[in-house]
Amino acid sequence: MRVRPASVYRYLLLGVCALLGIYTVYSIIGYDDGSHVPIHRPQRHLYLTVSQDRIGSRFGKLAPKRILYWTTIFGATVPSTALSDCPGLTDRCVIDTNRHQLDSADAVVFHAADISKFPLPVSRKPDQIFVFNSMETPDNSGRFAVPDGFFNWTSTHLYSSDAIHKYGTFLIPTQIAESRGFKVQSYYVQPKRLVKTMKGIFGLISNCHTKSKRELALQELGKHINVTIGGKCASDDRLKSICPAGVECIDVFEQYPFYIAIENTVCNDYVTEKIWSRITVPSIPIVMRRRVYQNILPPKSFIAMDDYKNPSEMANHLRSLEANSTAYGEYFEWRQKGLWTSAPWNAPGYRNGLCRVCELLWKAKDNETEVYKSYDNIWKWFDNESQCETDEFVRSWLSG
């Protein structure tokens, strides 16, 4: 039988079209835009970000993931609207606080400091994720005993957590923000605000007896440079009420060239409102240990006590900065030159808290993360990762 050339071409054309169709379907189903944001600290959890296309299309018809908050948070009930500020995820997860709905929950979150107030679940589904949650340090998180292997994921201030739950924002290089299409937030300071009316360091302190012995370090530093303490720990009664409760008092802080941002407890990645609520203050924050901040704040944006042998050496450097406006201004170049900005709140790649837990649950659905791992001893993990200090550094620094 003779085959006409036209028939051959027709069959070839149909074959090519079929192959193209298969390729197109595969591309749509298997596509992953690799949505992640490289930041100055290469942390595992920040890279594992689900493509919003995949969440929106592949799982769009599936029921939302249910996150059950088993405990309160320092006695307060978690609102059902807790996911309302999770762009792209607001309808992908729901928050529940009804413990009778345990069997329907995909993840169950336990706030560490409240665990003792509620009986632990007596059973769990094989595919259920139990999450250990705390924004505070181990010593301020209750240390209530739970069975070994009880928790699958961690959600703490530590950058090594499965789902980071930190204070403040993510500061990132402006170049990276622009490459991701983020709106750049300016931290520019009017030069006249860098001219100070007061000398030395200002601090607003309410905890007068800390584990790190911050008070001893400041007391000794005050022998070499002016250190003004306001709040409950002020020695001058007039300074005790200098800043009313709930007021940031930026106008007071910016009168001084330096301000105290030392935490009550010095632990890895533990950076609270002492920094974040004053990030716009045109003064240089003083911290205790550089290692805690160097991967969280821009380079040369703060001064650490452990950069100096002793209080005298530190005071000499601070006084030299007071006397040299050019050298002092170098600590604000990240602002003035627009080198750093904030990632948009809960943007992909920078999810925080429950938003990150929700995102991870969808990754688990797509078999892209370790779902069924467990922590043998959650408190041992928390202590080892936190590396909290007592007074060893201050004792050594004072004798240096």
Swiss-Prot record:
Subcellular location: Golgi apparatus, Golgi stack membrane
Residue numbers on the Lumenal membrane side: 32-400
Cytoplasmic compartment residues: 1-10
Pfam families according to UniProt: Glyco_tran_10_N, Glyco_transf_10
Biological processes annotated in GO: fucosylation; protein glycosylation
UniProt xrefs under Gene3D superfamilies: Glycosyl transferase family 10, C-terminal domain
InterPro entries for the chain: Glyco_tran_10_C, Glyco_tran_10_N, Glyco_trans_10, GT10-like_C_sf
GO cellular component, one term: Golgi cisterna membrane
Pathway(s) the chain acts in: Protein modification; protein glycosylation
One Gene Ontology molecular-function label: 3-galactosyl-N-acetylglucosaminide 4-alpha-L-fucosyltransferase activity
Observed effect of gene inactivation: No obvious defect in N-glycan composition.
Catalytic activity entry: a beta-D-galactosyl-(1->3)-N-acetyl-beta-D-glucosaminyl derivative + GDP-beta-L-fucose = a beta-D-galactosyl-(1->3)-[alpha-L-fucosyl-(1->4)]-N-acetyl-beta-D-glucosaminyl derivative + GDP + H(+)
Cofactor remark from the record: Unlike other alpha-(1,3)-fucosyltransferases, appears not to require a divalent metal cation as cofactor.
EC number: 2.4.1.65
Domain of life of the organism encoding this protein: Eukaryota
Residues that carry a glycan: N152, N226, N324, N367, N384
Keyword terms: Glycoprotein, Glycosyltransferase, Golgi apparatus, Membrane, Signal-anchor, Transferase, Transmembrane, Transmembrane helix
Membrane topology of the entry: Single-pass type II membrane protein
Post-translational modifications: N-glycosylated.
Activity regulation (UniProt): Inhibited by Ni(2+) and to a lesser extent by Mn(2+) and Cu(2+).
Primary localization class, coarse: Golgi
The protein's role, per its UniProt record: Catalyzes the addition of fucose in alpha 1-3 linkage. Unlike fut-1, does not add fucose to Man-alpha-1->3-(Man-alpha-1->6)-Man-beta-1->4-GlcNAc-beta-1->4-GlcNAc-beta-1-Asn (M3), Man-alpha-1->3-(Man-alpha-1->6)-Man-beta-1->4-GlcNAc-beta-1->4-(Fuc-alpha-1->6)-GlcNAc-beta-1-Asn (M3F6) or GlcNAc-beta-1->2-Man-alpha-1->3-(GlcNAc-beta-1->2-Man-alpha-1->6)-Man-beta-1-4-GlcNAc-beta-1->4-(Fuc-alpha-1->6)-GlcNAc-beta-1-Asn (GnM3F6) acceptors.
Family to which the UniProt record says this protein belongs: Belongs to the glycosyltransferase 10 family.
Protein name: Alpha-(1,3)-fucosyltransferase fut-3
Protein's organism: Caenorhabditis elegans
